[in-house]
């Protein structure tokens, strides 16, 4: 609770955890004293933009407190009083630091105490020479420029010593750090890293790190104070070894209340019907909460019976609002009622700041009377000619298609074919972005099949395959003699999947066997099955690798059947993984006393959702549309890492009968967006709809969406705007995120980037002790029971609301008030 002498009162609830602060308004209330003149807001609370001073380590630094009539001047750093020492000298209004170091970075303040009042100036000091997170521009001038002119064997040597001169790196927390050790040798040397003299492993650091062997670099993102230390790169081959050591110092950021740029927002004038915008630049290390407030009148008065002003919150940060969006207030189609006082209010865990501006509305100038002119016959003629040409083109296309259709041979009416040889060159289908890495040109034939068709009509198309040829891809080809096939894992769209052991498929462990999954064709596979499997393999090559998708590890394409080697997920698909971990009483089986394999917490479910959002964000960045995102298509590894699968499958979206069940009994329509369901339009936003259903599956521990709802009834309910109820043990914020994913208009749904940001924030603020209270029966989520617990549902086995208002689906019992949620 913060109060001012002028009578302005704001109450904020601030949550701070792990360096992240989140400010939310407890009450959208601003109280100003009636004696305060609106034209002259109290300047004592308007903090001007602080002076920024930067210095390199070892340089002198001087700050001057330019405040007049000071009886006494005191200095503080990050709120702690400063005094003279062997490095710091205070003389009058000057503060001098002899040799600056990274620990001198922070927020400095000088306070001048006068006879009747006091004043304060702020300085931001930054003593660092840090790498930026995008500091990869020098990756292209690495050791690749050095090529051995001869085959002479030699020990490793440094190729760019100028990039290694800086040994001390002092960076602020949350920055990205990159250390480079460009080297060369013959044979090509290997590189490994030590931290403080010990082997540096991924598990030694939260978030891990990246090693780019081709650029001889180590990259650590979002560094924290625990990352301080000495980092040594060791480059060696059989002829020698060299090493180089860097020292990393991480400087913690200095906390302070939000600082608003002076002069913003500025007073503005606009004519009736025009547009106007107010800009409020906020500087805050901790996450700020920003609101735009307008002083309004009620019944001709600006103040109520209790003497408090009437206020209206125009704009506040929501679940999917970024700081850049909230810093600007747009007013469209201005009217005289929009004139008045507007306030930008910013607060964080340290304090609150605000600036005020005025909007003046002017009457619109009278328009001169326009006299009608003669029609532009030339423009009319151009339009008519254009329409005629378009009609001719459409007619030509229709006639060509009809002609091609009549020429197609009817093989069913031909006599039996005893022998036919054909070659089918399948071209690469580029469905991802142009910058995606690929090992072959897009015009390279993927596979050439030579087949012999049997005269028996019932024989499979490839039952008599004599050969098929695939060009060898050295980047992905894996030796067959190092692959040992194991037990079957199941049957997929193109054939079967088996477990296998691959020796040396991990380049960092060339002699160790790694458990993998191998996709292969069945004996009765068709040409389409083969082409689909090849297409899936090529799609996975182009998309690249990510932690939260099933990655391609290699392929066996030569001298034998086609094997596609992918990552192995030992814990199966997410749907069964969640069901196996339900508390007793939620099982489908009769054994209600069975103890679940692991005890799930609320944070576990949020983490699962966050990982899948990151995987979908990566696929969206590669221009890949999944089209079948569901818990059954997510696999779980031994370390509980979520991996999205089947994103490279070829799907015939034009020949799907959505009114029939699939072979495993699940209806794909329950995960499909309305535009995909009714119009066969698949976009990244239709994947967002499916992600909302996937969230519902996660927070019901593998529940079936829309249990017991017939498909025909489901179509009707979706068109009427009905949506599923909030699952138990799901917060209102997460449920509102699901509802945002289920917006009827695709453009109103959040992007995966926004979902990642929101889930990252929720995950950071979630404790580990929030265990799920799911011991009750599962009738709300099980297709075997009617829904009797939902507060807004009726009928057997329904998850919808009874008697919804037109275009207004049933929501949980809370309402939106000026961008906030009232419960």
Curated annotation (Swiss-Prot):
Ranges in the topological domain labelled Extracellular: 24-379
Keyword Transcription regulation (UniProt): no
Cytoplasmic compartment spans: 401-823
Catalysed reactions, as listed in the record: L-tyrosyl-[protein] + ATP = O-phospho-L-tyrosyl-[protein] + ADP + H(+)
Enzyme kind, highest EC tier: transferase
Residues holding ATP: 489-497, 519, 567-569, 573
Residues at the active site: 628
Alphabetical list of CDD domains matching this protein: IgI_1_FGFR, IgI_2_FGFR, IgI_3_FGFR2, PTKc_FGFR2
Places the protein is found: Cell membrane; Golgi apparatus; Cytoplasmic vesicle
GO molecular function: ATP binding; fibroblast growth factor binding; fibroblast growth factor receptor activity
Biological process terms in GO annotation: angiogenesis; apoptotic process; fibroblast growth factor receptor signaling pathway; positive regulation of cell population proliferation; positive regulation of MAPK cascade
Family membership: Belongs to the protein kinase superfamily. Tyr protein kinase family. Fibroblast growth factor receptor subfamily.
Function recorded in the entry: Tyrosine-protein kinase that acts as a cell-surface receptor for fibroblast growth factors and plays an essential role in the regulation of cell proliferation, differentiation, migration and apoptosis, and in the regulation of embryonic development. Required for normal embryonic patterning, limb bud development, lung morphogenesis, osteogenesis and skin development. Plays an essential role in the regulation of osteoblast differentiation, proliferation and apoptosis, and is required for normal skeleton development.
Protein name: Fibroblast growth factor receptor 2
Species this protein is from: Gallus gallus
């Amino acid at each position: 609770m913060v109060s001012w002498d002028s009578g302005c009162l704001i109450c904020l609830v601030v949550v701070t955890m792990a360096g992240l602060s989140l400010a939310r308004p407890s009450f959208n209330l601003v109280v100003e004293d009636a004696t305060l003149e609106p034209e002259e807001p109290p300047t004592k609370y308007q903090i001007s933009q602080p002076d920024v001073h930067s210095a390199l380590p070892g340089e002198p630094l001087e700050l001057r407190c330019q405040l007049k009539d000071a009886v006494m001047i005191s200095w503080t750093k990050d709120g702690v009083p400063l005094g003279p020492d062997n490095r710091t000298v205070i003389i009058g209004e000057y503060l001098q630091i002899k040799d600056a170091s990274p620990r001198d970075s922070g927020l400095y303040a000088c306070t001048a105490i006068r006879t009747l009042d006091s004043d304060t100036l702020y300085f931001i000091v930054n003593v660092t020479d840090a790498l930026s997170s995008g500091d990869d521009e020098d990756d292209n001038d690495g050791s690749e420029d050095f090529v051995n002119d001869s085959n002479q064997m030699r020990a490793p040597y440094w190729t760019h010593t100028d990039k290694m001169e800086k040994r001390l790196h002092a960076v602020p927390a949350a920055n990205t750090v990159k250390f480079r050790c460009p080297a060369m040798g013959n044979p090509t040397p290997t590189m490994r890293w030590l931290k403080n003299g010990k082997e540096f492993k991924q598990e030694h650091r939260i978030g891990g790190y990246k090693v780019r062997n081709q650029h001889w670099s180590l990259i650590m993102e979002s560094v924290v104070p625990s990352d301080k230390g000495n980092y040594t790169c060791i480059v060696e081959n059989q002829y020698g070894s060299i090493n180089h050591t860097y020292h990393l110092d991480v400087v913690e950021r200095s906390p302070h209340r939000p600082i608003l740029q002076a002069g913003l927002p500025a007073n503005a004038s606009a004519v009736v019907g025009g547009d106007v915008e107010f800009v409020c630049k906020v500087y805050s290390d901790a996450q700020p909460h920003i609101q735009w407030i307008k002083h309004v009148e009620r019944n001709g008065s600006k103040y109520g019976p209790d003497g408090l002003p009437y206020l209206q919150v125009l704009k506040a940060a929501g679940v999917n609002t970024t700081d850049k969006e909230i810093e600007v207030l747009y007013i469209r189609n201005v009217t005289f009622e929009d004139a008045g006082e507007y306030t930008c209010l910013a607060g964080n865990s340290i304090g609150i700041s605000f600036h005020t501006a005025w909007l003046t509305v002017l009457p619109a100038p009278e328009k001169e009377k326009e006299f009608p002119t003669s029609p532009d016959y030339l423009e009319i003629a151009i339009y008519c000619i254009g329409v005629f040409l378009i009609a001719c083109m459409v007619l030509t296309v229709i006639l060509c298609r009809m002609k091609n259709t009549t020429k197609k041979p009817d093989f069913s009416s031909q006599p039996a074919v005893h022998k036919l040889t054909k070659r089918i060159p399948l071209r690469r289908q580029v469905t991802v972005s142009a910058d995606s890495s690929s090992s072959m040109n897009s015009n390279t034939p993927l596979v050439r099949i030579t087949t012999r068709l049997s005269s028996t009509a019932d024989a499979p198309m490839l039952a008599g395959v004599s050969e098929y040829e695939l060009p060898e891809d050295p980047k992905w080809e894996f030796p067959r003699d190092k692959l040992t096939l194991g037990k079957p894992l199941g049957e997929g769209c193109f054939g079967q999947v088996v477990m296998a052991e691959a020796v040396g498929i991990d380049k960092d462990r060339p002699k160790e066997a790694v458990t993998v999954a191998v996709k292969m064709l069945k004996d009765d596979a068709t040409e389409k099955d083969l082409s689909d499997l090849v297409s899936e393999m090529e799609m996975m090559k182009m998309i690249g690798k990510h932690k939260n998708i099933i990655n391609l590890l290699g392929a066996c394409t030569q001298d034998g059947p086609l094997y596609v080697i992918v990552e192995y997920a030992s814990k199966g698909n997410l749907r069964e993984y969640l069901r196996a971990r339900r508390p007793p009483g939620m099982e489908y089986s009769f054994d209600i006393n069975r103890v679940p394999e692991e005890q799930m917490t609320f944070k576990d479910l949020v983490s699962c959702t966050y990982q899948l959002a990151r995987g979908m964000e990566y696929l969206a960045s590669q221009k890949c549309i999944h089209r079948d995102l569901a818990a059954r298509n997510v696999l779980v590894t031994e370390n509980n890492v979520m991996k999205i699968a089947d994103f490279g499958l070829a799907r015939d979206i034009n020949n799907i009968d959505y009114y029939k069940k699939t072979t495993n009994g699940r209806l794909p329509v329950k995960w499909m967006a309305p535009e995909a369901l009714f119009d066969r339009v698949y976009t990244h936003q239709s994947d967002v709809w499916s992600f909302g259903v996937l969230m519902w599956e996660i927070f019901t521990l593998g529940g079936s969406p829309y249990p017991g709802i017939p498909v025909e009834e489901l179509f009707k309910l979706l068109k009427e705007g009905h949506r599923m109820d909030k699952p138990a043990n799901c917060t209102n914020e997460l449920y509102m995120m699901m509802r945002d994913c289920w917006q009827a208009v695709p453009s109103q749904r959040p992007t995966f980037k926004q979902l990642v940001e929101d889930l990252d924030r929720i995950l950071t603020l979630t404790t580990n002790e929030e265990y799920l209270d799911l011991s009750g029966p599962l009738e709300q989520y099980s297709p075997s029971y009617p829904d009797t617990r939902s507060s807004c549902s009726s009928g057997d086995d329904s998850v919808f609301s009874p008697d919804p208002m037109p275009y207004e689906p049933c929501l949980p019992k809370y309402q939106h008030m000026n961008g906030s949620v009232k419960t």
